[in-house]
């Protein structure tokens, strides 16, 4: 079984435990004895609390109790120094049923029709490509199919590409590439590269296709959807449909207990006062956002096209955006932005 981007933190331990227990249940049902966590077991790069470390310890003990071996690859959130071979997962590398990946390793069993090469995270604009080349030179041979499991950003996975992302062509020696890091499932067109999705939803910006990838001995694989964790759903509604029927639907989802719902109500600015935001919240919406169909960009963000943005200015603009959109958890975005060097963007 492959799973990634579990992101345990002091604020989500019950969700993490439910996530892992579901994974263990699937392993028991299907007699799976090997689990690979492909990066970002942890959320905070700065430090881990005792509660977090004990929850991970209990997770690994529960796997051992069911005779399941766990391979942990370090993700970018699992390291303080992104180029280091060792991260937080290495705290657990002496557990008898645990292997922690330093740089890369290969998993292969006599009954498998493939070899699974697992790599820890290294910066896309740093040493990753060199390390991948070394893996390909050392481990690839003609006989089994060669699968790769990594935790990286690859060009073509997101709607807006980044210069920092890796080019897809460097993965051509591999028959199949499974990837963590970006949380939504997607296949890069024209390649064998597939983002398998995080093990559960973390916020409203992610879709509901989250869970686990089961690799069979013949090299085929199956996505198994997470059923136990909270779902984050965004409902876009015109103002005329934001009445009793919508409230009944919200009450049903609240009674189900598995959904947090953000309602985005679209209406002309003049009609916004007719939307009963309080009633929608009372009916079970976690958030209600009013979107004016004819709204203009706020003055605060309509800066000159030629304005220079350094890292401080970008962070301030991001925080303003989150306040405007009522986004509570800004820490992950700020963590990514903190890597931007303190220099102007543009020409």
Q: Residue locations for each model-derived region?
A:
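Domain-start "cap" segments at the beginnings of catalytic or binding domains
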Residues: 1-13, 102-105, 210, 219-229
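N-terminal active-site segment of His-dependent metallophosphoesterases
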Residues: 1-59, 131, 135-144, 339, ...
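A conserved active-site cap/scaffold subdomain adjacent to cofactor or substrate pockets
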Residues: 180-239
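Active-site regions of enzymes building and remodeling cell-envelope glycoconjugates
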Residues: 97-99, 113, 191-195, 221, ...
């Amino acid at each position: 079984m492959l799973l990634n981007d579990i992101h345990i933190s002091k604020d989500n331990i019950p969700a993490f435990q439910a996530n892992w227990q579901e994974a263990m249940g699937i392993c028991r049902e299907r007699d799976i004895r090997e689990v690979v966590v492909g990066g970002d077991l942890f959320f905070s790069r700065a430090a881990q609390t005792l509660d977090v470390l004990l929850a991970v310890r209990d997770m690994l003990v529960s796997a051992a109790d069911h005779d399941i071996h766990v391979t942990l690859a370090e993700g970018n959130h699992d390291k303080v120094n992104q180029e280091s071979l060792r991260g937080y997962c290495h705290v657990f590398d002496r557990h008898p049923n645990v292997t922690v990946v330093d740089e890369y390793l290969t998993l292969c069993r006599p009954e498998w029709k493939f070899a699974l090469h697992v790599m820890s995270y290294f910066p896309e604009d740093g040493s990753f490509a060199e390390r991948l080349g070394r893996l390909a030179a050392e481990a690839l041979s003609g006989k089994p199919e060669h699968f790769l499991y990594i935790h990286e950003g690859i060009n073509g996975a997101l709607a807006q590409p980044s210069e920092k992302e890796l080019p897809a062509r460097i993965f051509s020696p591999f028959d199949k590439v499974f990837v963590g890091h970006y949380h939504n499932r997607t296949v890069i067109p024209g390649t064998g590269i597939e983002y398998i999705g995080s093990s559960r939803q973390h916020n409203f910006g992610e879709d509901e296709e989250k869970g686990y990838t089961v690799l069979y001995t013949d090299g085929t694989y199956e996505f198994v959807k997470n059923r136990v964790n909270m779902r984050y759903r965004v409902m876009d509604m015109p103002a005329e449909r934001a009445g009793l029927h919508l409230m009944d639907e919200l009450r049903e989802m609240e009674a189900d207990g598995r959904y947090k719902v953000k309602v985005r109500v679209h209406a002309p600015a003049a009609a916004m006062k007719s939307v009963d935001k309080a009633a929608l919240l009372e009916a079970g919406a976690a958030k209600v956002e009013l979107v004016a169909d004819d709204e203009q960009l706020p003055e605060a963000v309509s800066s000159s096209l030629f304005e220079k943005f350094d890292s401080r200015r970008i962070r301030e603009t991001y925080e303003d955006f989150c306040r405007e959109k009522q986004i509570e958890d800004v820490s992950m975005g700020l963590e990514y932005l903190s890597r931007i060097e303190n220099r102007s963007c543009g020409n």
